[in-house]
Amino acid sequence: GGPADRARVGKTPGATAAVNLYAVVGQRKRGGSAAEAKPLLGLADLPGFGYAKLSKDTKAAVEEAAERYLGRRRELALGILLVDARRTPSADDRAVLAALYDMDVPIVVGATKVDKLSVNELGPALETVREGLGLPDGQPLCVSSVTGEGTKDLWRIILDAAETRVEELAEKAQGLTASKTAEDG
């Protein structure tokens, strides 16, 4: 998509106070128009606020909006927490991670801005993030929008989680149908 399809990215981290929703569209039929392609999955980009210079009232409102949004999303297939690899994880980062754990969904943490770190700085920075958030080995995933590092891996994780969730929901629906049929029989 073009510029109108993207969220505005500012120089101030966490300044966005809106939930941005995206429909990731599957492949269109051969010779079909983009309008004929069916949504594959939905992505919700929740506002960040860890390092923003927001007023306490604004920060509280952003937190409340994010909590309300997440609280209604029982079909969530994956939680992704993006943190700046150059910073020690904040209490806000830990709170978001805890909220995702409470929702009992798979979680991946992406360490962003890795392109701004030297080879010598990267290892210690990732260890700081890992320890600060209590992450298992293999996380965080290095991600850079500048170099593209980790973006294909992140998309694979997203698509795998969506596919798994669809299979779970299909099995649940079959189970409900089978029990309804047994009750009616």
Locate the predicted segments by residue.
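Conserved nucleotide-binding/hydrolysis micro-motifs of P-loop NTPases
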Residues: 15, 48-50, 86-89, 113-118, ...
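Canonical P-loop GTPase G-domain recognition
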Residues: 116-173
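Conserved C-terminal guanine-recognition region of P-loop GTPase G domains, centered on the G4
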Residues: 63-139
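Residue-level signal for inorganic ion chemistry
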Residues: 22, 112, 154
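Short, solvent-exposed loop/turn segments at secondary-structure boundaries
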Residues: 54-58, 119-122
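Conserved NTP-handling cores and scaffolds of large molecular machines
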Residues: 3-4, 41, 70-73, 83, ...
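Amphipathic alpha-helical transducer elements in NTP-driven molecular machines
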Residues: 16, 59-63, 90, 94, ...
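Conserved G1/Walker A P-loop phosphate-binding module
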Residues: 1-53, 57, 163-164, 168, ...
